[in-house]
Amino acid sequence: MKNERDPHYYSHTRVDLIQFIPSGTTKILEVGCGAGMTGKALRERGFEKIVGIEINEEMAQEGRAFYDQIVIGDVEKIRLPFEKEYFDCILYGDVLEHLVNPWQVLKDHQAVLKRGGTIICSIPNVRNYRILKNLIFRGRWEYTDDGILDRSHLRFFTLDSIQRMLKEAGYEIEGLAKRSSGAHWVKWIHRLLGSRLIEFLVRQYIIVARKR
């Protein structure tokens, strides 16, 4: 379903992920590279080897100029043509929630990630208060064209389920960033209600994890 999207869907530059790439990284795999805007930004930053995976062939052709190689296909079905422990870092920018079995993909990709290598994921938080409000008080679970209840999402995660998924796949979380709803009043709510309730304001988590 993702490959039927408006072309603009594939044209985001994921600076929110790029900022967490560890120093010393040379070889990067971007899963779901779209039209290559993130690849372009990576190229401008001088990384030695940039590889993408993209299911949408038309978008992949658009992005080829920014990558050393783009593997076209379904990430859950293709076998990656790379040596063991080839990459220093793998990016999953809003990808895992679109997969049937993201747990297995994360495990499989350990083979091409070097020991101690990094993965950086962005994943929507289904525990956001707007989703819960509509579900609990209105009985509504309404899919949308984008966002947390994007129609093409097959899996839904909370912080706890994200942590368990990564741990079971063999990764250790080293960093966590939160993108929140109502950002101007988040700090006030945090002080008033306590840190445990902040998860209800989070729209998306960005997780930095290391291969054990």
Predicted regions and their residues:
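Conserved N-terminal segment of class I S-adenosyl-L-methionine
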Residues: 1-85, 89, 103-106, 121, ...
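A short beta-strand submotif of the Rossmann-like class I SAM-dependent methyltransferase core
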Residues: 89-95
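Short N-terminal helix/helix-N-cap motif within the alpha/beta-hydrolase-1
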Residues: 100-104, 131
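A short glycine-rich, Lys/Arg-flanked "PGG" loop and its adjoining helix->strand segment in the class I
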Residues: 103-115
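Conserved beta-strand signature within the Rossmann-like core of class I S-adenosyl-L-methionine
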Residues: 117-123
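Acceptor-substrate binding/catalytic loop of class I
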Residues: 145-161
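A SAM-dependent methyltransferase catalytic signature shared across enzymes that methylate proteins
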Residues: 160-177
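C-terminal lobe and adjacent flexible extensions of AdoMet/dcAdoMet transferase-like proteins
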Residues: 206-212
